[in-house]
From Swiss-Prot:
Pathway it works in: Carbohydrate degradation; pentose phosphate pathway; D-ribulose 5-phosphate from D-glucose 6-phosphate (oxidative stage): step 2/3
Single annotated GO MF: 6-phosphogluconolactonase activity
Role played: Catalyzes the hydrolysis of 6-phosphogluconolactone to 6-phosphogluconate.
Any single biological process term in GO: pentose-phosphate shunt, oxidative branch
Record's protein name: 6-phosphogluconolactonase
Protein family membership: Belongs to the cycloisomerase 2 family.
Source species: Buchnera aphidicola subsp. Acyrthosiphon pisum (strain 5A)
Cysteine disulfide partners in this protein: none
């Protein structure tokens, strides 16, 4: 299966497309201008569509992905603020856009061609709304509020309207700054990375008296035995096998590996690796064989191989990219 890598370069105002070989060797095949600074990108695999959040003319550009991974611009859709995170519901009928700077989460229907329409709902006053991600098993949208140190919980109705769950809100530690979120493959556990205090929270989802509940079961530092004042954590991802979790910090320029306890799904710190300068974004391929980290300040990205037995990373190569790479995705072509 052919793999391509998409890198969003904010200051260069472009998306780079790279081939990724099984050996880990990479080569640039396309560079497409975005007519503005770019931040989040995301893909709907079954439709071969890539969505990019553009500012200061706040909009989402939809690109088609051809059989070789090349991008072609299809449409522009206006949004009411700067996009920081793009995600979708399970059926890929709705697009969720988080805005850290405008403090909202919006819901936009996708038409039959996958094009975002005008938002049908905007929930304001979510301070520092940095990310929102749907738990497909429980039909709950987890909406991150970095500045409020909390996570809002919403059910999604069949009509695309968000309504608060019975629990409504999860509180993280004060001044922790929750930023990004990932679900365990079984969808029963949630991992959130806290930008400001350098920790990861582990949450368990369960049902009690037919009501869905979420509780915190662990808080663990991204760096072992280094409890310092300054952290600047950014991204978090888990392998599809559910055994390994990775998290990065931009202050220390590291990426840490955790093993996931197969009994309770809590995290066990394993190792940290020095990586590219200011690692804002990274991604893991679908086969769990490679991990790529983009250095926002170094304007480079590094590709590692992943050990199947331990999750350990081994550097393969470093490549130069555009100015200020802020988002990276690895896509398997059908």
């Amino acid at each position: 299966m052919k793999q391509v890598v998409y890198i969003a370069n904010s200051e260069s105002k472009n998306i780079e497309v790279w081939n990724l070989c099984k050996s880990g060797k990479m080569n640039l095949i396309q560079k497409i201008e975005t007519d503005g600074k770019i931040q989040p990108i995301n893909i709907i695999q079954k439709r071969n569509l890539l969505y990019a959040g553009i500012f200061p003319d706040n909009k989402i550009i939809t690109y088609s992905i051809n059989h070789n991974g090349f991008l072609e611009k299809k449409n522009e859709s206006n949004i009411p603020g700067k996009a920081n995170y793009i995600s979708f519901d399970k059926k890929k009928e709705f697009l969720f856009c988080s805005s850290y700077h405008s403090n909202f989460i919006s819901v936009s229907p996708l038409n039959k061609f996958g094009i975002p329409q005008n938002p049908i709902q905007i929930i304001y006053n979510i301070e520092g709304c940095h990310a929102a991600k749907m738990n497909y098993k429980y039909n709950i949208l987890f909406v991150i509020s970095l500045k409020e140190d909390c996570i809002y919980l919403y059910y999604l109705t069949d009509f695309g309207i968000l309504k608060s769950t019975e629990q409504n809100i999860l509180h993280t530690q004060k001044k922790s700054g929750p930023r990004h979120i990932i679900f365990h493959p079984n969808q029963d556990f949630v991992y959130t990375i806290n930008e400001l205090n350098g920790t990861i929270d582990v949450w368990k989802i369960y049902k009690k008296n037919n009501v869905i509940k979420v509780k915190n079961i662990q808080n663990i530092h991204v760096l072992k035995n280094r409890f310092l004042k300054d952290y600047w954590c950014s991204d978090i991802h888990i392998t599809s096998c559910g055994r390994f979790l990775y998290a990065c910090d931009r202050f220390f320029n590291i990426i840490s590996l955790f093993h996931i306890n197969q009994n309770d799904n809590k995290l066990v710190f394993f190792k940290s690796y020095d990586t590219e300068e200011q690692p804002r974004s990274f991604n893991i391929n679908s086969h769990n064989t490679h991990l790529i980290v983009a250095g926002e300040k170094s304007n480079t990205f590094i590709i590692y191989s992943i050990s199947n037995s331990t999750g350990e990373l081994k550097k393969i190569n470093v490549y130069s990219t555009g100015q200020r790479p802020v988002w990276i995705l690895i896509h398997a072509l059908c």
